[in-house]
Each structure stands twice: as C-alpha cells, then as structure tokens.
Amino acid sequence: MNNSINHKFHHISRAEYQELLAVSRGDAVADYLIDNVSILDLINGGEISGPIVIKGRYIAGVGAEYADAPALQRIDARGATAVPGFIDAHLHIESSMMTPVTFETATLPRGLTTVICDPHEIVNVMGEAGFAWFARCAEQARQNQYLQVSSCVPALEGCDVNGASFTLEQMLAWRDHPQVTGLAEMMDYPGVISGQNALLDKLDAFRHLTLDGHCPGLGGKELNAYITAGIENCHESYQLEEGRRKLQLGMSLMIREGSAARNLNALAPLINEFNSPQCMLCTDDRNPWEIAHEGHIDALIRRLIEQHNVPLHVAYRVASWSTARHFGLNHLGLLAPGKQADIVLLSDARKVTVQQVLVKGEPIDAQTLQAEESARLAQSAPPYGNTIARQPVSASDFALQFTPGKRYRVIDVIHNELITHSHSSVYSENGFDRDDVSFIAVLERYGQRLAPACGLLGGFGLNEGALAATVSHDSHNIVVIGRSAEEMALAVNQVIQDGGGLCVVRNGQVQSHLPLPIAGLMSTDTAQSLAEQIDALKAAARECGPLPDEPFIQMAFLSLPVIPALKLTSQGLFDGEKFAFTTLEVTE
C-alpha cells in the first residue's frame, strides 16, 4: 500500500505544526503533561521513563528531558505504564447489536481508540443509506472510527436475497471520504481467482488504499492467485499452518477472537519479533455481553500475555502499531513526537488494567460519554423503520417430508467456529440415525414472498424449543432453529412482530426476546441494558440444551455461503467448497 495514504488522514495545519514545534523545543506551554509514567517501547522493547507532553491532538515530546516542561494541566499517572490506544483491525459494529455511538461508549473507556469497520451488515439490509449513517457517526465520534467500503453486497451474487445493492458507482462516491481507509473484505474469492472483471474493477478502484481479504482455508495456487490480485490481509485463518503460509506469501494476518469465531489460541503461537509488524488483532463480531464482562481488544491482549507468553511490547505492538502501519494511519499506533495523542494508561500492563484513556489529546470520561449518548445518537439521524417485509408464518411452512431409508444432508456445527462440516444421516420410521438433528430454516424478509428454505442441523445442541433471529450473515434474513415446527413458527412470528430481533421459545411460549429496531440488527438501548438483555436471552437459550457459548452469533453464520462447508440461504442448501447449491437428499 502507498504510504502517501497517510496524507488523507493526518490533517494538521501549518499553524498547528508551529505550535507543536514550539512545545517540542520547550519554547511554549503544553496543554497536558503526563507525569510519573513509564512508556512501553513497542519498537525496541523495554520502557522509556519520563513525561509525555501534549499540544492539541498531538504528542509534542516524550522522555526525561520534559520533566520540567510547562503545561496548563498535569496528569499524575501514579506509576502507570503508557501504551498506544488499541486498534481493532476488522469488525462489524452491527454485530455488537449496538449503534456506533453506543459502541464507542462501551469500548473507548477500555482503551479501544480506533476501529476499522466494515458496515456491510447494515448495507446488505438498506444499501447506501446504511453506509451513510455509519459515516455520519464516524464524523462525530471521539473514537477514531474508520470505514472500509463494503465490497460484496450481497456476499455472493445469486446465492441469497438481500435488501439492497451497493454498486461500484455508489462505492466510488465514498472512496475519498476522510474516514474511509479502503475496500472491505473481498469475500468472493473464487470470483477474484477466476479474474471476474466486475470484482477486479472494485479492486482497481481502491488499489491506492487498503484491500481487505477473506479466504478461510485457502492454500496452494488459489491462495497465490488471490494475493496476486492485490489482496493484503485475511481475518479468516483458523489453522496455524494456514496463517503461517499467508504470512510467508506476504499477507498480513489478522488474528481474530470474536464471540463465535475464536482463532486466537490456534494462531497466537505464530507471533514473534520478526513477523509481529505483519500481525494484527481483530474481533470481527463480538457481542455486548462479552464486551461488558470480558472486554474487547484489551481482552485479546491479556490472553496473549497470560496464556501465550507473548512479550509485552509485542502484544501491544500487534494491538496498535502494526495495524496503524497496515492501514496507512501513520499518525497512530506509537507514543512518539508528532503522533496523535491516543494514550492508554495501565495500572497493570500484564493484566491490561486500564486506568485512564486519552484520545486526540483529551482525557475520556466514561460518565460523560454515557450522559451524552442519547443526544449524539439523535444527532446522527439513525435510519429507523421496519425492514421486515414478511407476513406471519404457520407450522405448516416448516413441514418437511422424509422417506425411510433415504440419506439426507446435515449441516454440522463446530462450536466456536464459523466453518461447518457437511455430513449426512439416514431417516427411518423412528427418525434419523443420530439424535442431535434439529431443523433449520431461512426465510427471506424483503418482500419476495419465497417459501422458507429448510434443512437439517447437527451438533448445535438444541434438545428442545426454538431460536430465531434477523441477524443472519450477510443478507440478514430470518434464521430459525428448532425441534418442532410449531415452536419455530412462534419464534419467527415474534421477531416479525418486533420488527427484527432475537427470540427464544420453549414449552410453547416465548421465553425471551430482544427487539432490534435499526435494520433488524441494532438496538438503541444502552450498552449496560443490552448486555443484561443478552444475558437473559442466553440464560433462556441454555434451557434448550448444551448450545454453543454464543448461540445467536453461531446461528447467524449458518447462512453465510462464503464460509465452508455447508450452509443454508434463503435459496436453499449451499456447498461452500464447490460454491454451488445442493439438495437436501443425498442422491449420489
């Protein structure tokens, strides 16, 4: 990527430079001086002793030579360790079910000062209007909220019904927006490898920025071809050797630890002094309960240090500087002169205990963020409105006919992974030859009046009841899993009535439900309220059987055709390895 991209983001006037230089020389008064602090050296390792002086949004100087520097305000760090603000290299804020405003309130006090966001969830539902709203939120945010322009809406052409398109012409209209860092994950990797001109046109249009990848399990000549097209990174790696090979071929590796896809344990052993500038941390999809109880990028850093013995400076490097360099955000990622003053003060660097956060040179107050949240959300003009164009359903809509002696395909879930296996099961008069088979259905919600696409699901752990949601990647149709058609219908009708959301049904009754009024994806509740509601949903879901740790996030990926092996879209069963539809009955 061309380093000149930094000029797009690093806006500083000549007057600001002169003021900054004057403070650096010791000829002018700083705005803030952070004293009694040690600075973690991400380049050499070890620590730098001495103050940090700040003028405006930027660091003017670091080190003992500024011990007596004049400043308008002094911050006593009380022996804390200072590190750069954390950066999430790839996420979909919508998957937190929070608005970008609420997400900032929940994560900025945890040290997450920068996010690289792909808003393709809301773009799949409402098109350019969704992207425009995210841009408005980013413009007013204290947090550095950067956007990658969604590249695959829908995820795979012709495989699902979604709510809107996002054409190249529309994408280009956002390319020069000050918050746009590049092109979001190019999920149609077979199309890129085969040289489809429509996809190459998108890559060419954003080649001077950053080109995000998406290629789970890809190897050999296909991986070489994908990288040849200009793809620069991947967040979908889930095996050690897969990650190593991508690094060898020049890709940057995003190590993901989300609520469903948990790849940190598999990939953390790769990180070392040599390759850490090419390694980054990301969450992709993380729900509000985990953010509240475990953390965000801070939780990933903690695990690298405590569970994988990654040296402190390397762990914090991959959480900040590596990502800033990759995206051309050269004003971020280091505590050094001329860099933006995004600073996290840690009372315990090994446990990632956040004491105080500064962003753009100003201390962050969590209570102020909470108090201003409602007004700032209203200022962003959220795109309210019911996006569920689906009539209520009945149990007969989920009726499947099976023939004794026949074999049927089953989507087999792998807990805490996005990939699935494709297995089969024989049906007899007593049912299937395995007792963990549930029913799954996907119902398009955009007014096409299609019959539900139905299939079989194994390994999910559902012993009774039903779960339904409008969070269903990436087209966000209605997905429902159940043991009976009656309870599946009840769950679906509840989310239709709510205008989108999540629902748990058991014993013929709705046990818990969460309305998501923005695009059927996001709530307008506070982060704390949302976490409590998620807690109630998870508790209700656990009564239905030994489900995955995050059942709704795991369920949401069962309809995403660009991740192998077997998925179900509104169009039917899809073989994610052959990239073709297949039948429920095994006929070969």
Curated annotation (Swiss-Prot):
UniProt GO molecular function: adenine deaminase activity
EC number: 3.5.4.2
Swiss-Prot/TrEMBL cofactor(s): Mn(2+)
SUPFAM superfamilies given in the database record: Composite domain of metallo-dependent hydrolases, Metallo-dependent hydrolases
Biological process according to GO: adenine catabolic process
Sorted UniProt keywords: Hydrolase, Manganese
CDD domains registered for this protein in UniProt: AdeC (cd01295)
Top-level taxon: Bacteria
Enzymatic reactions: adenine + H2O + H(+) = hypoxanthine + NH4(+)
Enzyme kind, highest EC tier: hydrolase
Pfam families xref list: Adenine_deam_C, Amidohydro_1
HAMAP family given in the database record: Adenine_deamin
Quaternary structure note: Homodimer.
Similarity-based family: Belongs to the metallo-dependent hydrolases superfamily. Adenine deaminase family.
NCBIfam families the UniProt entry points to: ade (TIGR01178), PRK10027.1 (NF007457)
Protein name: Adenine deaminase
Taxonomic source organism: Escherichia coli O9:H4 (strain HS)
Gene: ade
